[in-house]
Amino acid sequence: LFRSGMIERDVNHPSIIWWSNGNEKGWNTELDGEFHKYDPQKRPVIHPQGNFSGFETMHYRSYGESQNYMRLPEIFMPTEFLHGLYDGGHGAGLYDYWEMMRKHPRCIGGFLWVLADEGVKRVDMDGFIDNQGNFGADGIVGPHHEKEGSYYTIKQLWSPVQIMNTSIDKQFDGKFSVENRYDYLNLNTCRFLWKQVKFPLATDASNAAVQVLKEGEVQGSDMVAHSAGILDIKTNILPNADALFLTAIDPYGHELWRWTFPVNKLNQQTEQLSPLSS
């Protein structure tokens, strides 16, 4: 079963880059040598939450402890580093951990626990999903794969295209600072859609929609993988625009992320209210 049910079944799967022997250190050590007998690529065997074959995979270390692990000679790759239930959602703290991980040469990433909420569909309770209170509600998505709040945080932080601007104002000239975090693709394989919009007022009808004032599309700048530069969407902010939407689309037509930049009108309002403005 070990040979046919896992190794021979998955030996050519493109997503298999390690073999995981057990969980939380595991006790199947007698099987460690069996993997390479049937794997021509002889991919590394790891023991999650253990230090084995050059990988330190310890789970749920604090931010400070994680930095200490990165000073050790082994590759640091926590096979669980944020828990969807006990850490208050996968998005809580992910930015801080991820920025530390991606900048450190000894860390190659980590894993979140877990993809989907887990539970037993009770036929004796009219299909109610029983996860013993909240013990199985630790997924990025729900039991029916509905998107939860952390889904969007993860999508934003792990997007291979990152806009570094945090705000814009009425003097915005259309130029964004951008990082291309793809491993191989040039940013010019992506395209960017933008919209300047005006939001309904609280006094407007309840069915009032966001008004698109102006929109356009640009190709990504010529920017090789793992580099930074400028993306020019070639527009200035309209006087009555409340926000600018910017959407990155990958070469296959999938949305990477959509950023919303409220137009900072503080200076404009100050000028209007100040008696010195005249």
Per-range role (PLM):
Residues 100-278:
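Carbohydrate-binding surfaces of carbohydrate-active enzymes
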Residues 2-145, 149, 153:
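Substrate-binding/catalytic cleft of secreted carbohydrate-active enzymes
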